[in-house]
Structures are given as C-alpha cells and as structure tokens.
Amino acid sequence: MILSIESSCDDSSLALTRIEDAKLIAHFKISQEKHHSSYGGVVPELASRLHAENLPLLLERIKISLNKDFSKLKAIAITNQPGLSVTLIEGLMMAKALSLSLNLPLILEDHLRGHVYSLFINEKKTCMPLSVLLVSGGHSLILEARNYEDIKIMATSLDDSFGESFDKVSKMLNLGYPGGPVIEKLALDYAHKNEPLMFPIPLKNSLNLAFSFSGLKNAVRLEIEKNAPNLNEITKQKIGYHFQSVAIEHLIQQTKRYFKTKRPKIFGIVGGASQNLVLRKAFENLCDEFDCKLVLAPLEFCSDNAAMIGRSSLEAYQKKHFVPLEKASISPRTLLKKALSE
C-alpha cells in the first residue's frame, strides 16, 4: 500500500491505497473550515498550526487501519506543490520522517495532477487521454491529460479563481466561509430564475481562452453597495442567484470555445467547487451538445483529499519516480506546463 498525505491548504488528510488494484483502503480527513470562517478565508499561519495538530491525529488512525503493521507500506506520497508554503511544509516534514524511519521511498505529487486522478479513485484503469476542468478556491483551469507525465494547462484564470470569487461574494454578503455551498443554497431559494441576468458575462467578446472573475466580483460589490440600506434576504438571494448564474455561464462559454477547437471525446470536472450541482448540470448539457462523455469526481473527493494523491502516486510508484530525502522540497506553484498557445 501507499500512504499518502495532503496538506496544501486547509484540509489535513491521510489515505491508504492498495497498489495491486488501486482500491482505497482508508481515508481520513480533518477540515479547518470552522476555524477560518470568521476570517472569510484561509489564514495561512492558522492553517499551518492546525495541520501540525491534526496530521499526527490522522496518523494514529492510519496505524489502527494497518494494525500497526507498517510492513504493508511500500511508499510514502506527499503533495509538495502547489499550495501554501507554510502548510505544504507540515505535510512534507511528516512524509520525510516516515520515509526515513520506515526506510520507504518518497513520492512527490503535484496537487493539480492529484485532482485529475480524483476521477479514478478505486479504479485501476484511467480513461486518459481526456480534458479536465478544475475549479476550486485556488484554481480555474482547463487541463489536457494525455497520461501521468503529460498534463498541460490549456486555460487559466487571469485573476480570481471560480471558488475564490464565491468566497469573496459570500463575505460581501456577510454569509460566511466557505462561500460555495452558501451561495448555491441562496441561489436555489431565489424565486425568479427566468429573469435576465443582471451582471455582464466576463470575457464574452474576448478571443483569449481564459477565465476572469474580478470584474464580476466588482459588479456584485457595486450592486451590494447600491442596495446597502435595504439588503434583505430576497435581495441577497437575487444577487447570489445572478452571480452564480453568470459565473457558471462564463465557465460554459469559455469551455465551449475550447470544445470547438479541440473536440475532446472525454471531459472531466474536478476540484472543490465542482460539487456545485448547477455547474454539474450545465456541463452535462454542454457535453451532450458536443457528444462528449462527461466524467465527474465523486462529491466526497472533490475538495482536497489524500485519496486522490494516493491514486495519482500509484502511477509514480510503477515508474519508480522516487525522490531522495535531501532533494524533497515544496513549491507554492505548479510545475505543470502551460500550453496556452496550442
């Protein structure tokens, strides 16, 4: 089995993945959302301190799953990029300590690649090549995944990410953190869903394949300020509904532009923000339009987790992509290549 560790942001997670058939044997996770809620977003120093507390607790649960028989382990895998440096280092320190004490090889995994492999948790075979939309609090990307070693970034955000924009709008409306589920619920409760959209769709006439949410966020801020004296629940529902609708329509329009050029046969959606059911339905319709098979990460594995890191690390294990402890390091940025001109 491979023991995998995820600590790139505000989720502490450990998992055990069986090498022979890619089955997830154990998965444990502690979320920090309640600790960051009052701040309206993740506080890096607080996240780091909580990882230092939570990772050892999760390791104790892993020990129970193994019956303290560490001979079952064949490698240690750790997310080392991209993410918050102060949280990545907490996971790496644990991984290096385990690798050294158990004399096991160390695998460094890219967090974005891990999200792609969240589509294949508990599955030995993948459906690569495929294209993938990754939407989360830190990223809005279209990826082309031909195989484990060949994953390219085809489109990215020029400013805020999709999930980050939900968090910021939620904060402006005093609705708490994380913003994704709150805004989705707010939009669901709005009664007048057939009215014209009140915010402009970003990059509607741009020739660039990219995402942008800062202009939409600013339009929402102006609308909130305009209604500030009478910002009742109905007004919040209206703003939430129109914001979500425009944000998702922006994703659809840009992805459709990609579809017209690349014509993918299989398209996956991953990342924490991909739990949004309105988004999922919109992409079902888009894929139907282009006769493209849609694959979705299971809801429980959309947000950051060690299970996806374990699944992706199986590929590295088979290829013996091990890293000496003295060369193991972290990076706040991904090393996946950009191919925006393709």
From Swiss-Prot:
Q: What is this protein called?
A: tRNA N6-adenosine threonylcarbamoyltransferase
The task this protein performs is described as: Required for the formation of a threonylcarbamoyl group on adenosine at position 37 (t(6)A37) in tRNAs that read codons beginning with adenine. Is involved in the transfer of the threonylcarbamoyl moiety of threonylcarbamoyl-AMP (TC-AMP) to the N6 group of A37, together with TsaE and TsaB. TsaD likely plays a direct catalytic role in this reaction.
Q: Which InterPro entries match?
A: ATPase_NBD, Gcp-like_dom, KAE1/TsaD, Peptidase_M22_CS, TsaD
* Location of this chain's protein in the cell: Cytoplasm
Q: Name one GO biological process term.
A: tRNA threonylcarbamoyladenosine modification
Catalytic activity annotated for this protein? Answer: L-threonylcarbamoyladenylate + adenosine(37) in tRNA = N(6)-L-threonylcarbamoyladenosine(37) in tRNA + AMP + H(+)
Give the main location. Answer: cytoplasm
Write one Gene Ontology MF term.
N(6)-L-threonylcarbamoyladenine synthase activity
Q: Which GO terms describe its cellular component?
A: cytoplasm
Q: Which UniProt keywords apply?
A: Acyltransferase, Cytoplasm, Iron, Metal-binding, Transferase, tRNA processing
Q: Which parts of the sequence bind substrate? A: L134, V135, S136, G137, G138, D167, G180, N276
Q: Which family does it belong to?
A: Belongs to the KAE1 / TsaD family.
**What are the EC numbers?**
2.3.1.234
Q: What class of enzyme is it?
A: transferase
Listed binding positions for Fe cation are H111, H115, D304
The note on cofactor binding and number reads: Binds 1 Fe(2+) ion per subunit.
Species name for this entry?
Answer: Helicobacter acinonychis (strain Sheeba)
Task: Identify which cofactors the protein needs according to its UniProt entry.
Answer: Fe(2+)
Q: Does the keyword Iron apply?
A: yes
